């Protein structure tokens, strides 16, 4: 289980032309299905005159939520090659949309696969890939007299303090790399028995 994942920093674009058909590709960093739906709606409105608006997305640090859509192209000739480019770069939290303007010459199954793959590759090559840290939050409630001990653990393990409330009973919420969360919880819970 990794503490990081790869995604892109900002929107990027690419273009691929084959036998007068033009393939416009756009890659977006995304976090939710709703965000993806909104972007797809926008693209379908903006490029209403395009023959096809095909896409693929990958969501989540574990890369388990994904979809590929051919939007009327022959089965597996558009969405799958786009998704293949996302997979080959091991990216997640990403949407890649490829819009096709038909140029009058049929490309055939293999031609479509190559065109959608290359258009997606162009957009992804133009993107800045970044590494994000996967964090878990830990909330700990303790009496004020334990403050020094708690802060010593915080200093040693260096979690990010998300929220803190200090009174007779204190509450602190910490964010830490996923792999370190069990150790942080264990160290804080041990303090209660000192």
Predicted regions and their residues:
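C-terminal regulatory domains involved in ligand/effector binding and gene-expression control
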Residues: 1-77, 163, 181
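A common structural junction motif
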Residues: 47-50, 157-162, 189-194
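Conserved mixed alpha/beta catalytic, RNA-binding, or beta-rich assembly cores of soluble enzyme
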Residues: 75-88, 112-116
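Short amphipathic alpha-helix segments
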Residues: 141-158
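Terminal, non-globular segments
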Residues: 174, 180-183
């Amino acid at each position: 289980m990794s503490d990081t994942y790869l995604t892109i920093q900002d929107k990027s674009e690419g273009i691929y032309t084959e036998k007068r058909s033009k393939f416009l590709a756009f890659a977006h960093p995304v976090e939710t299905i709703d965000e993806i739906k909104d972007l797809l709606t926008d693209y379908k409105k903006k490029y209403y005159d395009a023959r096809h608006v095909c896409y693929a997305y990958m969501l989540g640090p574990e890369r388990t939520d994904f979809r590929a859509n051919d939007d009327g192209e022959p089965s597996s000739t558009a969405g799958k090659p786009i998704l293949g480019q996302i997979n080959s770069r091991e990216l997640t939290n990403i949407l890649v949309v490829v819009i096709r303007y038909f140029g009058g010459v049929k490309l055939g199954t293999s031609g479509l696969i190559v065109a959608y793959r290359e258009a997606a590759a162009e957009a992804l090559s133009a993107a800045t890939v970044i590494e994000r840290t996967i964090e878990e939050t830990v909330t700990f409630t303790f009496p004020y007299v334990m403050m020094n001990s708690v802060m010593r653990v915080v200093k040693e393990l260096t979690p990010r303090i998300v929220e803190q409330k200090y009174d007779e009973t204190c509450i602190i919420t910490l964010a830490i790399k996923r792999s370190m969360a069990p150790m942080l919880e264990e160290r804080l819970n041990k303090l209660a028995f000192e």
